Amino acid sequence: MRRYQFTSESVTEGHPDKVCDQISDAILDGILEKDPTARVACETLVKTGMAVVAGEITTSAWVDMPVVVRNTIKDIGYTDAAMGFDYETCAVLTAIEKQSPDISRGVTEGEGLFKEQGAGDQGLMFGYATDETSELMPSPISYAHRLARKLADLRKSKKLDWLRPDGKTQVTIEYEDQTPVRVSAVVVSTQHSPEVKHKTIVDAVRSLIIEKCIPAKLMDKSTKIYVNPTGRFVVGGPFGDAGLTGRKIIVDTYGGMGRHGGGAFSGKDPTKVDRSACYYARYVAKNVVASKLAARCEVQIAYAIGVAQPVGVHVNTFGTGRVGEDVLEKYIMQNFDMRPKAIIEQLDLLKPIYRKTAAYGHFGRDEFTWEKTDRAAKLAEDLLRPTLAAVPATTNGAGSKNGSGSKKEPKRKGKKETGAQA
């Protein structure tokens, strides 16, 4: 029996990097609404008094980018020049060119070396799922997102009118083997107006945010709670720190539990496998866990630019699988179509849905198509039949008696945590 800690963080929508993600995805949505086949790679930088939008966009649509930028900043909550950054007075600069024809020919059917629509770039993408929460996400990132969203809700409802848009949260969970047993530390840092006292902030965050978001049974006298541990957080947002699109990729995914291939999501249309293949890898991994074939599952997909079929698929069930990983890999490759065009069609990715993804995580939210578990029953039916379950595995030790190809499934204590969804 091993006890260990794991920590994940989240940020609010007013964090400067998240401001950029939301601007990039708001521009993407504005274009896709008028031209679903557009090619978009849109990056944003924000700093005091300015926002810069740059990238490569090929489209028949016209979008008033400065208006989209300002409306997004306004929606987030930067409405007062006293914060050092606001939607009315900030300058908006744009530097946009068309997509490179050398890239376009690999993504456009019939133009490259291969007939099919190929991947928009080479790269490796990961998807992950675990049964420790109802949304099949790791507990630390689920609770961190929940805290961050609660900060924004209380600010926007004006229940805590001294809150400002920038903020960060962090949760450390103590595990026994693979089961979360307690919260060992919580950190909440929130931007605030200058007149509010530190004790007022601490008391409100404890009672209205932490105690509302984290189950009491996971907290104890030894749980460490830190609220604005520097004692003051007035200067924040783009006034305090420069922001860039794509700098919160761990917040966007699994909080560090489950690997990341390095590609960011926001501002990219779904021909970019950095985005669409990560969504699909999550879809596959979540269906595996929902089918009870494994308690944890990580799926890696890798592509070559301009080529439709992935060059590699890898499945890891971390010793929790009920069938061998080689059996699972073979089944996934035969039954889940991972070509970029097929992913886009299966997950319905040409709609303007992306602004919503750009804060509080891309995964663990039922509103998105890649969170469906519509393949779980079929997976269980096909792979838990005795004839298939008996197939010897070779992935993590050939010829194991239980046919799992991995370590014996650990006993998981207690009921799994639920209600961690942001």
Swiss-Prot record:
Spans annotated as Flexible loop: 99-109
Record Gene3D superfamilies: 3.30.300.10
Locations listed in the record: Cytoplasm
Residues holding ATP: 15, 166-168, 232-233, 241, 247-248, 264, 268
GO biological process, any: S-adenosylmethionine biosynthetic process
Protein name according to UniProt: S-adenosylmethionine synthase
Organism, scientific name: Sorangium cellulosum (strain So ce56)
Pathway per the UniProt entry: Amino-acid biosynthesis; S-adenosyl-L-methionine biosynthesis; S-adenosyl-L-methionine from L-methionine: step 1/1
Co-factor binding details: Binds 2 divalent ions per subunit. Binds 1 potassium ion per subunit.
Enzyme Commission no: 2.5.1.6
UniProt entry keywords in alphabetical sequence: ATP-binding, Cytoplasm, Magnesium, Metal-binding, Nucleotide-binding, One-carbon metabolism, Potassium, Transferase
Region entry Disordered, spans: 390-422
Cofactor(s) the protein needs: Mg(2+); K(+)
The protein's assembly and partners: Homotetramer; dimer of dimers.
